[in-house]
C-alpha cells in the first residue's frame, strides 16, 4: 500500500489521456462526441436505469469520478471505496468543499471485504482501478453478487497485456515509431517495457479483465480507445516546459502523429485495444 499512500506523487499531467488532443480523441471513440467524456455515455446506453440510487466506485482515489457522477445526475448516492486512507481523506475533503457530502460518502476498506458484505447495488464502477486486482473471475463474481439483477457494471480500464506479457514485438513497434519523432521531443534513448516496479499490482492480470467480465456479465456496450502506442511512448516525450524542451507545436505534433498511427492500427485490428470502456449487466 505504500505506493498509493501519497496520492500527490502520481502526476495528473503525466497521463497520456490528459493531453487535450488525446482526451478529445478518446471521447470521440467512446461517445462519438469529442466534448463528452465516457461517463456521459451512460445516459445513452442505459437511460431506463438512471439515476443509480445506490452506486459504488471501487478504487476511488481522490474522488474525481464520484463528483462527476453526482454533477451529471448519473447517481442518487455513491460510495467511494479505496484502500488508501490518505486518498479517501482527500476525496472526503473535496466532496465537502463541493457541498456534496449528502450524496457522496467514502470508505477506506479492502474492496473484497466491502463487496462481500454488500448487496442490492444499482451500479459498481471502476475507473483505472480494476487492472490492479488479481483473481479476476472470483473478484467479478463478488461484484455480480453485490449488484441487483438490473444493476450495471461500468469500467473504464486498461485491458492490455499484463505486466509479464510484454514481448520484443511490442518494443520493436514502439521504438520504431519513437525514433521517427523529432530529436527535440525524445527524452530517452529507447522505450522500455512499461512495468511499474514500485507498484506490483499494476497490470497484474489486466489481459484477463474482459474474459472475466464476459463470464459474469452481458456486455451492453463497449468503446475501445487504444493506448497501444501512446501509453508506453508518452512518458518518454520531453515536455515543452522542461529544460531544452521542444516547442509546444513540436510536442503537440508528435502527439497528433501518434494518434494517427493509433487510429490506423485500431482500424486494422479492432479487438487489439489496450483500453476500453464497458457497460454490462449481470448474467
Regions found by a protein language model. Give the residues of each.
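N-terminal, positively charged/glycine-rich alpha-helical extensions of SAM-dependent methyltransferases
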Residues: 1-26, 36
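Substrate-binding/catalytic lobe of Class I Rossmann-like enzymes that use SAM or dcSAM, i.e.
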Residues: 183-242
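Class I SAM-dependent methyltransferase SAM/SAH-binding core
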Residues: 63-64, 68-101, 105-113
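Conserved class I S-adenosyl-L-methionine
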Residues: 51-61, 152-183
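A short glycine-rich, Lys/Arg-flanked "PGG" loop and its adjoining helix->strand segment in the class I
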Residues: 137-152
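A conserved beta-strand element that flanks and buttresses the S-adenosyl-L-methionine
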Residues: 125
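Conserved alpha-helix/loop element of class I SAM-dependent methyltransferases that forms part
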Residues: 21, 31-52
Amino acid at each position: 500500500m505504500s505506493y498509493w499512500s501519497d496520492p500527490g506523487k502520481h502526476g495528473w499531467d503525466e497521463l497520456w489521456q490528459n493531453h487535450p488532443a488525446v482526451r478529445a480523441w478518446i471521447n470521440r471513440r467512446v461517445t462519438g462526441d469529442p466534448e463528452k467524456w465516457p461517463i456521459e455515455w451512460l445516459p445513452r446506453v442505459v437511460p431506463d436505469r438512471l439515476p443509480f440510487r445506490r452506486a459504488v466506485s471501487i478504487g476511488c482515489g481522490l474522488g474525481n469520478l464520484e463528483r462527476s457522477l453526482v454533477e451529471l445526475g448519473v447517481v442518487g448516492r455513491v460510495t467511494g471505496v479505496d484502500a488508501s486512507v490518505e486518498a479517501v481523506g482527500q476525496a472526503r475533503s473535496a466532496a465537502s468543499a463541493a457541498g456534496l457530502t449528502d450524496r457522496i460518502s467514502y470508505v477506506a476498506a479492502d474492496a473484497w471485504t466491502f463487496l462481500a458484505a454488500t448487496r442490492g447495488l444499482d451500479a459498481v464502477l471502476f475507473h483505472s482501478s480494476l487492472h490492479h486486482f488479481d483473481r479476476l473471475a472470483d473478484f467479478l463474481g463478488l461484484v455480480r453478487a453485490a449488484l441487483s439483477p438490473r444493476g450495471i457494471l461500468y469500467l473504464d480500464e486498461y485491458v492490455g497485456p499484463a505486466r509479464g506479457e510484454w514481448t520484443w514485438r511490442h518494443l520493436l513497434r514502439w521504438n520504431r515509431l519513437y525514433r521517427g519523432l523529432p530529436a527535440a521531443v525524445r527524452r530517452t534513448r529507447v522505450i522500455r517495457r512499461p512495468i511499474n516496479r514500485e507498484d506490483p499490482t499494476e497490470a497484474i492480470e489486466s489481459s484477463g479483465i474482459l474474459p472475466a467480465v464476459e463470464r459474469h456479465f452481458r456486455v451492453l456496450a463497449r468503446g475501445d480507445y487504444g493506448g497501444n502506442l501512446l501509453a508506453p511512448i508518452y512518458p518518454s516525450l520531453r515536455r515543452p516546459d522542461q529544460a531544452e524542451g521542444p516547442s509546444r507545436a513540436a510536442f503537440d505534433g508528435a502527439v497528433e502523429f501518434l494518434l494517427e498511427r493509433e487510429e490506423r492500427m485500431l482500424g486494422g485490428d479492432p479487438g487489439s485495444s489496450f483500453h476500453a470502456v464497458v457497460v454490462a449487466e449481470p448474467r
